[in-house]
């Protein structure tokens, strides 16, 4: 559902090229082919290949012509694109007639494909689904790449973890400029090419714009996204309700587990009172209002311990772990009353940016937000 909505949105925005990463093949080759038919843009990849021949399963490169205008003058520029994704030795997908799809080394694939692309393009752009370290190696191995546009494809990285500020916004290696996309489509990158009198690309001007609430949504695209978000939430709800209504087994006694904020209030009464008046104590209501209470991408920052052993499961089984309670920041506390330790649960403001990322919380300013949730001073005064 989400992929179909993304394709619809990319069509509406006039995308011309997209890099084929392993995620597009997660549901199998046949599903990808059907989605490819819906796309009004081209998928490229030089290192997702047929195992028997070593040939890419889609075009490895493509050229897009763009007309640049400066007053009465105009120039047609040929932009050459190559797609590269991380090499996963364990990746293996079945294709038609028993053929299999694998990945090969992206740097070697680039070396193989770029000589031909150089003959057809004025500027070469590499679209990469690589971690930053690999992306840095690309311009060292392959010359004449003018721009590298990247998105992180590290296994296990969630939407919450893949943040724009994980990477340099504008890092230059040799002649190539390396820029990484943010998460959730909330960052707009603008690149302006500058050509000299001979018509050659001499430099480029780059800017990254955070799409905060100051930028209104496109009504049509907002409707598409709202529809798919509600549909995904409903699907997740049905899957969750089909599971056992009972909570997961309690971890062994040797391990601390989550208990819920009410238990903390027995000793930390004043701190609990301050917390109860904060927006953290009502964080789950935000999901309910947006029909996203079953969205696994949202739950880690609106509940206690979602995805962790003994953490939040669903409203029926773990109602005590709803909202951003004490243990969401300070950790599981079941053993704390009996084994009080100095420094238990101690955190600092750096912990806040786990959830208050630029994508999820664009208005977050520590100096303004922290005073709204301060409760540790009151608790200390009581002692």
Which residues make up each language-model segment?
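Acidic, metal/ion-coordinating pockets
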Residues: 1-213
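Alpha-helical scaffold elements within enzyme catalytic domains, especially in hydrolases
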Residues: 9-12, 116, 266, 274, ...
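Histidine-centered divalent metal-coordination motifs
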Residues: 22-23, 129, 151-154, 268, ...
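Short, glycine/serine-rich, charged loops/turns that create anion-binding
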Residues: 86-88, 131-132, 305, 333, ...
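Acidic, Ser/Thr/Pro-rich beta/coil linker or hinge segments at domain junctions
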Residues: 207-227
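Sequence context of c-type cytochrome heme-c attachment sites
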Residues: 220, 226-347, 364-383
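A contiguous, mid-protein "functional segment" used to position or interact
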Residues: 346-360
């Amino acid at each position: 559902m989400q992929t179909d909505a993304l394709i619809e949105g990319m069509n509406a925005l006039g995308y011309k090229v997209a890099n084929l990463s392993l995620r597009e093949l997660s549901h199998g080759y046949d599903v990808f082919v059907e989605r490819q038919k819906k796309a009004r843009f081209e998928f490229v990849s030089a290192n997702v290949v047929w195992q028997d021949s070593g040939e890419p399963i889609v075009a490895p490169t493509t050229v897009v012509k763009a007309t640049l205008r400066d007053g009465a003058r105009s120039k047609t520029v040929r932009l050459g694109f190559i797609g590269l994704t991380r090499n996963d030795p364990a990746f293996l997908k079945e294709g038609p007639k028993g053929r299999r799809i694998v990945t090969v080394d992206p740097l070697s694939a680039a070396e193989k494909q770029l000589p031909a692309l150089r003959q057809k393009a004025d500027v070469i752009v590499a679209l990469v689904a690589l971690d930053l370290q690999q992306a840095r190696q690309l311009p060292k191995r392959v010359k004449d790449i003018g721009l590298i546009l990247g998105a992180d494809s590290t296994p296990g990285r969630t939407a919450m973890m893949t943040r724009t500020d994980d990477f340099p916004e504008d890092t230059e290696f040799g002649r190539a400029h390396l820029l990484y996309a943010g998460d959730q489509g909330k960052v707009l990158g603008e690149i302006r090419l500058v050509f000299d009198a001979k018509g050659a690309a001499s430099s480029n001007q780059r800017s990254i714009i955070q799409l905060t609430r100051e930028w209104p949504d496109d009504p049509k695209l907002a409707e598409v996204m709202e529809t798919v978000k509600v549909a995904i939430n409903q699907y997740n709800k049905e899957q969750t309700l089909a599971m056992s209504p009972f909570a997961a087994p309690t971890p062994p006694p040797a391990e601390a587990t989550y208990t819920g904020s009410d238990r903390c209030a027995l000793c930390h009464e004043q701190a609990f009172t301050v917390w109860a008046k904060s927006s953290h104590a009502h964080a789950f209501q935000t999901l309910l209002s947006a029909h996203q209470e079953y969205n696994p991408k949202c739950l880690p920052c609106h509940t206690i311990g979602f995805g962790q052993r003994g953490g939040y499961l669903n409203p029926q089984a773990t109602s005590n772990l709803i909202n951003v309670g004490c243990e969401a920041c300070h950790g599981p506390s079941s053993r704390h009353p009996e084994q009080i330790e100095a420094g238990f649960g101690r955190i600092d403001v750096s912990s806040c940016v786990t959830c208050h990322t630029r994508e999820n919380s664009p208005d977050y300013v520590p100096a303004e937000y922290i005073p709204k949730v301060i409760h540790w001073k009151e608790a200390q005064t009581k002692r």
